[in-house]
Every structure is written in C-alpha cells, then in structure tokens.
Design a protein with these regions (language model features):
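Hard-cation-handling environments
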Residues: 1-3, 21
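Domain-level signal for soluble alpha/beta catalytic cores
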Residues: 4-7, 27-44, 50, 139, ...
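Structural motif
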Residues: 7-12, 94-95
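Redox- and metal-dependent alpha/beta enzyme cores, enriched for Fe-S-associated oxidoreductases
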Residues: 11-79
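Acidic-and-aromatic substrate-binding clefts and catalytic sites of carbohydrate-active enzymes
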Residues: 13, 67-72, 98-102, 128-131
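Extended, charge-rich low-complexity interaction segments
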Residues: 58-79, 83-86, 148-167
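C-terminal hydrophobic structural anchor segments
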Residues: 72-116, 120
Length: 167
C-alpha cells in the first residue's frame, strides 16, 4: 500500500471494481466510502411518536442528505474522517448529475488548499457510463497521480484497457 484514501460523494454505480483498480494500479488503499460514515442508528421504538422522531432524525442526519443539503459543518466532515483514518488523500466523486454536490465543489477545492491531505476530484455520471466512461475515470486518476502525486503506477498494464462493454 502506497497511499490511504477515503472517497466522498456518489461513486459510479457502473464500476464497482474502482477500489480494486486503484489498489492494483496505483497502490491506493480505499479505507472507506462516504456511506460507511453513517454510524449505527438506534431508533427508540417505545411508541409511535418516538419511532417517527427517530426516523426523522435518521433522515435528517443521513450521509446523502447531509452531502446534498447539509449544514455548514458537512463540507468539512470528510476532512475529519480522512484525518481519523490517517489518509494521504480524499477522492471526491464529482457526480455531474448531482446539483447539490456541484455547488459544494468550489468550497471543497478552497478547503483543500489549506490542508496537507491531497484532494483528487474524479468526475463521473453515477448511472450512465456513456457520459463519463470507466476509461475516462481511469484517465482522470492517472493524470492526477502523475502530475500531482509524481507517482508511477505499480502495474502500467492497468492504466488503460478496453472495458466499455463490460458490466
């Protein structure tokens, strides 16, 4: 393992092997993804009122809800998580179809300038591989790793390959 990273934002649903590729090609160990930071939610089931209150609070503080419309604290939350896990970088999945996340990208880029943890922004279309393909995503990562991290791949044969028709 060369690098430790967490991901934030909606990853492409059409490339579940992204963490495997990161590790095998570049030595980036994906410690955790955004959805793992929800914690264990315990809802009081004493009566209907407490159940509804618990469900409402869970929705109010759920990761995707905070990610899209959360308060001022949310945009810095992943920096705290990256620090807890001793990460070298945060990989921000910049889903081009998510207006909430697009609005935060500028704020997050400004925050990254003040941090030692690197920020890799990877654009994707969560549900449509024709818009931004797996090859496009690989190229974004490759460009970042070469230019920002000044790194060489562990396995150059994995930099690009034809998987356009792959599921």
């Amino acid at each position: 393992t060369r690098y430790r990273a967490i991901t934030w934002g909606g990853p492409p649903c059409y490339w579940l092997q992204f963490p495997n590729w990161l590790y095998n090609c570049w030595g980036i160990l994906m410690i955790a993804g955004m959805d793992l930071f929800s914690g264990n939610v315990i809802i009081d089931t004493t009566d209907e009122e407490t159940i509804l209150d618990g469900i409402a609070r869970n929705y109010e503080t759920g990761v995707m809800r905070r990610h899209l419309t959360g308060g001022w604290r949310h945009p810095v939350e992943f920096w705290d998580e990256a620090e807890k896990f001793h990460c070298d970088m945060v990989i921000l999945h910049d889903d081009i179809t998510c207006k909430g996340a697009l609005g935060l990208t500028g704020v997050i880029l400004d925050q990254a300038k003040e941090r030692t943890t690197k920020l890799m922004v990877v654009s994707n279309d969560m549900f449509d591989h024709r818009t931004i393909s797996r090859a496009d995503i690989r190229q974004q990562v490759n460009d970042y790793m070469y230019s920002v991290m000044q790194a060489e791949p562990l396995d150059a044969s994995l930099l690009q390959y034809d998987d356009y028709e792959g599921w």
